[in-house]
Amino acid sequence: MSGHKCYSWELQDRFAQDKSVVNKMQQKYWETKQAFIKATGKKEDEHVVASDADLDAKLELFHSIQRTCLDLSKAIVLYQKRICFLSQEENELGKFLRSQGFQDKTRAGKMMQATGKALCFSSQQRLALRNPLCRFHQEVETFRHRAISDTWLTVNRMEQCRTEYRGALLWMKDVSQELDPDLYKQMEKFRKVQTQVRLAKKNFDKLKMDVCQKVDLLGASRCNLLSHMLATYQTTLLHFWEKTSHTMAAIHESFKGYQPYEFTTLKSLQDPMKKLVEKEKKKSSRRENREAVAQEPRQLISLEEENQHKESSTCQKEEGKSVPSSVDKSSADDACSGPIDELLDVKPEEACLGPMAGTPEPESGDKDDLLLLNEIFSTSSLDEGEFSREWAAVFGDDRLKEPAPMGAQGEPDPKPQIGSAFLPSQLLDQNMKDLQASLQEPAKAASDLTAWFSLFADLDPLSNPDAIGKTDKEHELLNA
């Protein structure tokens, strides 16, 4: 047996059983069951999960590094595009200002030329930022494709070993439920599963250590990469700001004493004719405003004159209204006096005195007074009844029997028949009549006060205290 290792038949049988197809199938079954539990998120053993807490923290850090590096690479690419676009636009603006400055020979042209040169210089200096950014992007991509990818492979192998280890633990848990140490039942099977668990744990611990070390190294290398590349970018950016600010400050100092210009941007293009029309409209509106401001005191004066004119016109209207009303009243009194004279047996000549007296047209201020006097004198015709009866007894009642000429509306003709009043006897009788009337008028006027009460009859018909209690026809007619 020298030179040869001797193994017992029991160890050879056990090794053969471990390599059997049945053992491999059982091992794959419990690994698949563990993967299913992890995928579905079912609750696992608390102690097993707690033993892997530090590993889970390292895995979370690794996934964060992987995600942030991908976002950083995308941001760098987008930032480079924006810088190129901004530099191009700034260069175009500088060229435009320079071209316009060459055409303008004033101070504004010089300022535009200097500003255009400064903008072109700034655009060129801004393009210098692309060099550290391109280097930064290359370093990040290298870090992603090498360091992170290598760590990711190690993490995948570690996860596979952890699944095998936890599956072996589930298998051992299931076998231990059927184990009976007193009867040595299932003892060989338990030992076989226990050996599988130890082997899986050994591989898992080794890969676990590798993953933790690689994640720590990955974090440190990422910090080193960012600090180095960002320092280069920061230096380039500071140089760019320094050169640009120095150039802009020099231009500002050189044109410090120049008068500033007010520039307006066009929101829409307009034709020259439209501009002229708008200018004319603005000028006309300004003129109208000035004229309105100048006419304000004149309008105030004219308002006072208009007020005075309105007051005078209203007074004239009121006077005009009062005159027709008085005329209407006089015509109504004349219309009423006609039937009253007929009832009182008054002569037509005396009844016609009232209308004849009112024929001349006096002034508007004296019309009311004349109408009142006519009303007063018309009542005196009631006292001349005795003289008319005596005249009728001596000379007859021929004149009374003659019908009085009627007008168009049944009223007596206001013109008296004076065709035969030129005989000597009639003239003598007329003189006698005037003398008797002049002697009787003062006495009758003092005794009879009905004329004065009839003056106020329009205001208060019941103002005659002498007529209260009297029922003769004369007072009834007066009250009516």
From Swiss-Prot:
Signal peptide positions on this chain: none
Disordered: region residues: 276-338, 400-421
Membrane-topology descriptor: Peripheral membrane protein
Biological process (GO), any one: regulation of protein-containing complex assembly
Keyword set, alphabetical order: Cytoplasm, Cytoplasmic vesicle, Golgi apparatus, Membrane, Neurotransmitter transport, Synapse, Transport
Annotated SMART domains: Arfaptin, ICA69
Designated name of the protein: Islet cell autoantigen 1
Species the sequence originates in: Rattus norvegicus (Rat)
Gene that this polypeptide is encoded by: Ica1
